[in-house]
Amino acid sequence: MSLLENLQKLIDQTSLEVTDQQKQQLVQLVELLNKWNKAYNLTSVRDPEQMLVKHIMDSIVVSPYLIGERFIDVGTGPGLPGLPLAILNPDKQFVLLDSLGKRLRFIRQALLELGLKNVTAVQSRVEEYQPEHKFDVVLSRAFASLHDMLYWCKHLPHEEGHFLALKGQFPAQEIKELDKEFEFVESISLQVPTLEGERCLVKIKRI
């Protein structure tokens, strides 16, 4: 079975609406990541079939919860979840931020090959990045603890903006230890087809 057919089977198990062109772009992204990974070690996931589940599906299930127009993916690594989400949301603007040059080179190549016009790749440490305009949502997928994410990223959302952290199990202890300037809003349970283990999306705002 081809990657495209496999992706279709996975998407069919969700309520996501994905166009044929977007499916092609998602598969292209996996093929490119697999190719670059052999030389640059961008992800510990080596199998393209597993990349579909652990990287693509795990990212795009967040799509229905993206409210706003401007998003920043902090500590994006090889563009996850930012690139898959940008493919599904061509009307929204994404900044993908990471401090490692090899990751940014991959992202820029992906933007070129996939023809994505709604993504800006930025090489910077998150605490040093000063955007011209604040963001509606700050996204993180593999960025340390909630405390660290909020501490380093608190200058990024505008007053009405919020934080979305993609987590495994519900991080009860981390939420209990939030600083007083932050408020836990909700945790959304995410269903990622064929992925073992829990996934949740934690929403937090500044008070």
Curated annotation (Swiss-Prot):
Keywords: Cytoplasm, Methyltransferase, rRNA processing, S-adenosyl-L-methionine, Transferase. Specifically methylates the N7 position of guanine in position 527 of 16S rRNA. InterPro entries: rRNA_ssu_MeTfrase_G, SAM-dependent_MTases_sf. It is found in: Cytoplasm. It is an enzyme of class 2 (transferase). This is Ribosomal RNA small subunit methyltransferase G. NCBIfam families: rsmG_gidB (TIGR00138). S-adenosyl-L-methionine binds at G75, L80, V126, E127, R141. Its EC number is 2.1.1.170. Belongs to the methyltransferase superfamily. RNA methyltransferase RsmG family. The gene is rsmG. Coiled coil: none annotated. PANTHER family: S-ADENOSYL-L-METHIONINE-DEPENDENT METHYLTRANSFERASES SUPERFAMILY PROTEIN (PTHR31760:SF0). The lineage of its organism: Bacteria, Pseudomonadati, Pseudomonadota, Gammaproteobacteria, Alteromonadales. It holds the Pfam family GidB.
